[in-house]
């Protein structure tokens, strides 16, 4: 019976440890900038006055992905997405839209 308690306590501690590790990974991913295939700390995010716009560079297994966060929505391709009236809009190649980053 005592052995069962030790196993349960051990499994619970592993579970808690994995949750804390995942939350630290998420925090670390949110403040990264891509440079030469490496993600580096980025102190600045883009917050424009017109809306809640953030450019976030994230390292996914050594590959840097850039997202545009617009009013709580995340657009997967920053180069083709922009925030218009609080919504993410995906523009076509070569198309210009107001308030879109170039």
Curated annotation (Swiss-Prot):
Transmembrane segments: none annotated. Keywords: Antimicrobial, Disulfide bond, Fungicide, Plant defense, Secreted, Signal. This is Defensin-like protein 285. Disulfide bonds join 39-100, 64-83, 70-88, 75-90. The keyword Membrane does not apply. One of its GO terms (cellular component) is extracellular region. GO terms for biological process: defense response to fungus; killing of cells of another organism. It is found in: Secreted. Its main location: secreted. It comes from the Eukaryota. Belongs to the DEFL family. Residues 1-28 form the signal peptide.
């Amino acid at each position: 019976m005592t052995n069962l308690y030790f196993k349960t306590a051990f499994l619970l501690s592993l579970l808690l440890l994995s949750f804390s590790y995942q939350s630290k990974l998420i925090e670390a991913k949110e403040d990264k900038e891509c440079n030469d295939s490496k993600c580096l700390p980025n102190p600045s995010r883009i917050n424009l006055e017109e809306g809640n716009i953030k450019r976030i560079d994230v390292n996914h297994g050594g590959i840097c992905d850039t997202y545009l966060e617009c009013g709580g929505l995340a657009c997967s391709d920053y180069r083709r997405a922009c925030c218009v009236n609080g919504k993410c809009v995906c523009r076509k190649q070569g198309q210009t839209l107001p308030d879109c980053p170039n």
